[in-house]
Amino acid sequence: MTHLSDLDIANQSTLQPIKDIAASVGISEDALEPYGHYKAKIDINKITPRENKGKVVLVTAMSPTPAGEGKSTVTVGLADAFHELNKNVMVALREPALGPTFGIKGGATGGGYAQVLPMEDINLHFNGDFHAITTANNALSAFIDNHIHQGNELGIDQRRIEWKRVLDMNDRALRHVNVGLGGPTNGVPREDGFNITVASEIMAILCLSRSIKDLKDKISRITIGYTRDRKPVTVADLKVEGALAMILKDAIKPNLVQSIEGTPALVHGGPFANIAHGCNSILATETARDLADIVVTEAGFGSDLGAEKFMDIKVREAGFDPAAVVVVATIRALKMHGGVAKDNLKEENVEAVKAGIVNLERHVNNIKKFGVEPVVAINAFIHDTDAEVEYVKSWAKENNVRIALTEVWKKGGKGGVDLANEVLEVIDQPNSFKPLYELELPLEQKIEKIVTEIYGGSKVTFSSKAQKQLKQFKENGWDNYPVCMAKTQYSFSDDQTLLGAPSGFEITIRELEAKTGAGFIVALTGAIMTMPGLPKKPAALNMDVTDDGHAIGLF
């Protein structure tokens, strides 16, 4: 049986005018800033806050296969299912990054009949937010180098500049570069490098800001480097926070689009969860809470990455509690964690599902540690067998875990009604949400708590560089920040080949980064890179554009 591609399904769908989508949740036309017929930005100053804000449902996942487990698909499909049940609902997602779109993932707007549209536009530039973030980031780099060239009044040590340039592309050749070459008229030579845009602190700040004033305040606190006597230098010292915030004045506004079934969707911000905090913007989530009774959102990768950061970073900053958490599981991921090779994942193997269930079990238990009841969504794939699915259901029943088979890829909202009903039962009950750790704990203890309680590790080892940074960060008064772990998404450990639910392992923190603007400390583990590279056969090889300007190959 031939299945339509995601792009074919998207192209066959009929979109409603964006003003009609806006009106369906009470957004007035004067609050709408259209970008064509089917996209718009929202002027948040013209949205009336309401007292009884909508409840937030977070969608996370078990540790994924390289292809991903359809978390965005389930997120959109669940929102469509609530829509099917006549609930007042919105979905809030991150924006896709171009680098991974051309790399391994292809597009990132959901899949099958659970997508947000217009799919081509969202995957390719969208409303220009990533361009603005890239520009603001690189403008700061230009201001830093110009300050040094013009006499260096602040005494910045060019050997200790922490701020890097960014690009929205996977480009390993740019990880380490030299700038300022070519003689005295071209600046002061120094080592530099590029990160991918989604790893930029500007991206994190945009997603954690509640207003333009908050955005400007956070930008002013960015630590760009140090003086020769190791004193931090901030954007406020350079006096360019106003200029940088000005570049972002439109990017900070949430973007309104729609699902295939007409569910309103806010798609805004896009930090990765393995190298950043992995959540869409607070402004988009809070705007949705002012407009809808239920807000379905997602956090990148598994509970060990995006969900933990959602609970310990985003929720702290935003000030709301999640009402329910959905953990997406797939039969293929369970088999992978049960020892099946990638090429054999389509073959029935109930024993491998049994062996791999330990991975899902740890993710479920992780959510419980935050005081929220999880609901498992089995995201159905065409090669799943009844025996494999029934085993997962029986495991859930034995362990008193809520579960639903979800067929939103194939059926849209109708395929997610069982999941929606399970979630409705949870959000109607009180929970006892609490973050994993108190901010007053020393940084190393916060890291140890994440490693031992969420990852299942036994010990944290700090490199000599990380130990020196811990000491320096404490002296600078940065000990009370939350921690943002940078770690592989494929394993609970820092070794991506260690699958299932390993325990007793050690995690090495090789380096720390102070994101004093965003307000967290990044702890880098293993070989994690903040500028990815492209695979041997990038998804770009299957992409093209027709003579009349339509994309081909965006999945």
Swiss-Prot record:
Class of this enzyme: ligase
Binding-site positions, ATP: T65, P66, A67, G68, E69, G70, K71, S72
BP-aspect Gene Ontology terms: tetrahydrofolate interconversion
Record's keyword terms, sorted: ATP-binding, Ligase, Nucleotide-binding, One-carbon metabolism
EC nos: 6.3.4.3
Catalyzed reactions per annotation: (6S)-5,6,7,8-tetrahydrofolate + formate + ATP = (6R)-10-formyltetrahydrofolate + ADP + phosphate
Identification of the protein by name: Formate--tetrahydrofolate ligase
Gene source species: Staphylococcus aureus (strain Newman)
Name of encoding gene: fhs
